[in-house]
Amino acid sequence: MLEKTFALLNDIPGGTYVPDEKKCYDDAEIEQLSQILKRLLWAPSQIRKKLQQAGVTIIPCNFYSEIPSIEDIERSFDPPVQNFDLIFDDSGMKEFLAELHQFSHEFDPPREAIGGGSYSWEGNPFSFSDAMAYYCMIRRYRPATIIEVGAGWSTLVADLALKANAAGEIICIEPFPPEFLRGIDSVKTLIERPVQEIPPAFFDASLRDGDFLFIDSTHTVKHGSDCLHLYLSVLPRLSRSVFIHAHDIRLPATFPLNELRDKHVYWTEQYLLMAYLIDNSRTRVQYGSTYHFLRNRQQLNAFMHGRFHAGGGSLWFSQKGAPSA
């Protein structure tokens, strides 16, 4: 089955965009496959569960689908991209970055990976200006406690900064921890459970004024997701004044066309985050790697000192404590 189509795909790496005029499939084979998939679309859940265990989900493609069609994705890039200025204060964010800059000369890890649970710029998903900003945030604001929801390479950065402060500890909530996480000195608690299982009261009891909540989630807004728990249950109930981080946030832009169309990146966390921030008198956006890359690149480049590429997906905001009842 699909012999002709697979022959056409042999020299095309996965995730590669192929324009419509360069056909990479056999019509008859794709029609046959479509009929099979339509039959399986409404198959008993045990069949669909088996497919999901193999890493494949079959879902309907229609007006109500939460996964955008390729036509919808391509069409959405025709008009100008919404700039989402409702949550950004340009002058305030530039001043905040200038405050962080005073510590940026300290953070100078090796460029190439050296292994052994040591941080390097290359070979990890938490790099670019995100890593520099995290280090400088910790050095500038000296949190006593950091809760990391999603831990790993970012924890190595935090450990370096906390050691420079000579104070502070990390609580990691990570259901699939890398082995090196267990050997990081600043990690005092490792909770190997999904964050959805952690009640909001735990966060409120663990964080004091000036502490950090670092979120690097699945980035998905769906039934039972970590994002729903964090943004709808945890954050509104925090009673202390804290700094909050979210990762892989591209605001004020959307995700690039190639990531949506060719890499299946349909992350929607940033839109729930934006809804949380709009007209929220308790919050103020302080730093955004993408924001500065798009609108303040000269200052962001200076912040990096030429050590690695500027940019990234970190967004930091402050949240005031809840008023007393």
Predicted segments, located by residue:
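A short alpha-helical cap/connector motif
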Residues: 2-245, 249-325
